[in-house]
Amino acid sequence: DLPAAHTTLTDILRRYATEPEVGDIARLYLCRLYTLRGQLFDAEEELQHATRREGEVLRQAPQLYHTAAAELDLARGEDSTALTHLTVLARSEKTALQRARLSFLIGQLLEAQGAREAAKAAFARAERTSPQPALELAAQLRTLALTTESGTGIHHLQRLARLRRYAPHRSAIYLALAEALLASDQREAARTALRQSIDSAQTLRGSATEAYTRLGLLALEDQRYV
């Protein structure tokens, strides 16, 4: 309930106007709330107010500060600055799942910037850390997508598809396998992988929908060049 949260936080600012330690924490939460609402100017203003006492908020609530700053930077499209805050958060995060999520996000941002090796390292950290098979697999798939040796990636994906641990996610694995096969110009094998993606899907959404689309595009390409 964002309106209720806003009312509570502004009330805290009024009640504790003479206690900057309390006010700074409230302002960091307000920064996050405004970022969520898309009110980025207001979010920036609250962040500046919260950090006006140099170093204090970093000592008092480092996790909250870096979270608020990273969210605002991401909302403004300032990914490089956000990476600095996210890296600090990932290093200090105590829960394995959240640490893995942060590493995965860092990997996505680095990949978007073209820093392939750094992205692979971040995805590898997410894979090692994640207690959830779905996130672990997603990190593996991103690492394989960044692997330049297509044969290695294809064999690894084929092995993943056979593992019972990833049975609920086979549709996504076969889709990634199809993309790797297409990249190495193995069209018939890619078609087989796309059909396996569809057949192994629990619902006709997500990976299965994309596999159907890719099969259709391949058929159109075949007709065009016959």
Question: Residues of each region from the PLM?
Answer:
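Acidic, polar-rich low-complexity tracts and alpha-helical solenoid repeat scaffolds
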Residues: 1-226
